[in-house]
Amino acid sequence: MPQNEYIELHRKRYGYRLDYHEKKRKKEGREAHERSKKAKKMIGLKAKLYHKQRHAEKIQMKKTIKMHEKRNTKQKDDEKTPQGAVPAYLLDREGQSRAKVLSNMIKQKRKEKAGKWEVPLPKVRAQGETEVLKVIRTGKRKKKAWKRMVTKVCFVGDGFTRKPPKYERFIRPMGLRFKKAHVTHPELKATFCLPILGVKKNPSSPLYTTLGVITKGTVIEVNVSELGLVTQGGKVIWGKYAQVTNNPENDGCINAVLLV
């Protein structure tokens, strides 16, 4: 046995101290507090490097937790479905000609490119920057004013990772992040609570679109897979656009009309 491993040798012969495991548990419990105290006291380049390292660790930890959660959730097994099986709502579409389907698809794509959507609200009031973005003063003497906090409802995707708070320019509060919208189908005259996939266009500013700000008149993309809508080719439609018709920041919910 190497000369420097005398502690391991002693433990093999006589076992651990009686209070060893208790002491270890308490030390691990204190570690988080000690690390945070260290982070608060550090200044300069050392602090920057330390915060960067801690930020990377936190991201890794969150990703690991998410993976564990995914592992525990039950997922539908697609392999059990027979290969030739067709859902009931597609049975009458078997004899449709391929050429007709293709021409309709091309027409639809051209229509989408041209952006010929008849929206329920063609004109909406523009939202000013002072109204949407509140100035946050930072620094020891509160002299810096480059940070902005979004004061309207916004959508943030699942894969979004925050920058370290020190370098984050636009802050989107958790209380204003929405994931679902109440979407009304104009032909069916029914309302569904559907998950939001993204913000297509905010009429006020391209900046609001990139930030995912949802105000009255914003066009959002929603997941309509549970509605059972299908294309002429028999494929299930996954996402569709809808326009927001209310002021979500006042009502506490997003009401939208599906664009069909």
Swiss-Prot record:
Chain location of the short sequence motif Nuclear localization signal per the record: 11-18
Pfam families reported in the protein's UniProt record: Ribosomal_S8e
A GO CC term assigned to this protein in UniProt: nucleolus
Bias (Basic and acidic residues) ranges: 20-34
Membrane-spanning ranges: none
The keyword Nucleus is assigned to this record: yes
Primary residence: nucleus
UniProt keyword terms in alphabetical order: Isopeptide bond, Nucleus, Phosphoprotein, Ribonucleoprotein, Ribosome biogenesis, rRNA processing, Ubl conjugation
A single BP term in Gene Ontology: rRNA processing
Subunit details: Component of the pre-66S ribosomal particle.
PANTHER family: RIBOSOME BIOGENESIS PROTEIN NSA2 HOMOLOG (PTHR12642)
Name of this protein: Ribosome biogenesis protein NSA2 homolog
